[in-house]
């Protein structure tokens, strides 16, 4: 955490390892053979750490007696309901009196027959399983049949049996959802428990009074995705984790434990706080203690409070301070983390405890100097990202969150924006552990009770995370900036005030596509601009004391592996094209990266995403804004950012050199590089040497002839790096490459497999589009496939896929039994030449499973 004073500095105001093996194994990122990140300095660090002994995955949610938090993901059953026909919706809503009496919902009792329901584990997104439909109204959500006009595929029911042992007789028990899309009704043992109408904020229900102790219990969750929260693909169903949490009646309040650090000289002061609630039958005398533990497990500080008396159904606030000598600061290069073990004691014993992860750091936004972290100037090199991925939709396994962040980190990114909603906890935790800063954004910009509730949930949930450097209360709320600017100013002020009340350590802002002269912007600590590079330049002249950053920039568009725009095929060339309101990668970064007063910014977007197909409509089913595609395969612009954001030398030449039939035509050849000079060779002959402009690129026009193009980058007259593209032959074989060849046998971990086609020389064929089939057997299961083609309407859930410009991706998930996962890939169909099939084996190792509700 940073200084308790909000980290804004207008003009008038003024020995530990970085990422540990423990952190990597926490989410299964330890790499035995990674083709994704091994090339970068960060990737080399990951690979090095992977060679050291690690920790079992269960320690990710280590139980601290007597509290239990049990994963509630396994062993569910699912069936579609219906949005308008009660007869096809378990009879729900057939009578106006459904809610008249408690305990009468038969579908959540033991006698109900669910034998024909589909068995599945969570997280689950049913929208990604549905076919595509040509519907202009649905284009922003990815042309999936979800919404009020599709009642037969917009409601889903989840059901599960579970045991509550007799030992839980005197405990409080909650079911906790990290997120479900969108409108949720929960029933337990025939009783209606509660509802939630937001697709992103976590929610929970106290089940204590409704459970049969020492017996079987039944929970049913109805999820209705008829309405959306955004204008992008959002999925449908219980797409995040579910937990069953058990505590003593005297327990810590949810998300009430805070650790706020103030760095001074070589030390830091920790302001510790929490709230204890008493849901027992008697008045309790309780005290709270803190134990601060570093990454090695060593206790480095302690604190304790005097006892307080807490009334029945009452609560008490506890606070203390602790000192850290020579703290290991959290930074993007060394994301050092500490844990605070918070314990409630009463009657001579521990009644409740929890572990709170935090970091010590100081983040400052300055009106003249931009952004600094721990006193060092640092540009925010960020991307905006939605939360879906090829093959799995919105239901991302935890490991895939780390995979996606690793792609962005490999590019040189050091920050992400959670566009446009509260993120999943695993994304935030991965950012904490990887050293990725974050702009954390709420979905609904409103000072209504519902809007403030969502905002409060987000801030409380994540205010201890060092990766978060600013809160965002909204995105492009142009009505609140224009005709309702008066109301917008009041809404913005109320939301900013709520953020400051809950977390006085961070700045508050929003992504604004107006002039920031009125409306919601009045109350912001720092000013964010979406696009319009003249806007922030003029604003800075008029308001030189307000810190600025690019909240959303670029909107460059391209199709991976495509080098000529074709409106009939819905493809865009890779030469840094933009939409009318956007800027090229070079233009936006020259402005935000080149002006000292700008803190940096967030490019739209890191990954391609489903829905909002831009610049084309049907049959395009996802956007083409990404710097990488839906699978995480880099587009050429990736290497512009890698050159100017990263620390490693870069030379990247493009396009590929397979242009049969275009002999003699001029082909633009570009090179992204951070070298002093680049010389281009065409079939062994020099086409000239060029100096590389700062934050720019070099380019030539070359008459195509089969052979090779090669770029040689030099510094100080010495060639340091080369990159080459050769004309390949036709594809003759398939190759499979896993991001890891060993994963955890925990029922959750995944391996991400790159599929490519090779010619007879073993070279990747960049134009191959063969249709392949996949077979997965052994100790794992196929869970999804993709290829990064924005126009591909093949199923993400069938084990077959066409290569797109030479690539596809398969995702497999481990079972809980250690062994081997066998993946096979072969060409499907009789068209074209035969391809040599490929096989790959992934080992799944036995690990201690994290605590979970037993799978029936």
Regions found by a protein language model. Name each.
Residues 272-276, 669-672, 712, 748-766, ...:
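Beta-strand-rich structural segments
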Residues 17-26, 31-60:
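N-terminal twin-arginine translocation
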Residues 1-19, 30-33:
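N-terminal secretory signal peptides
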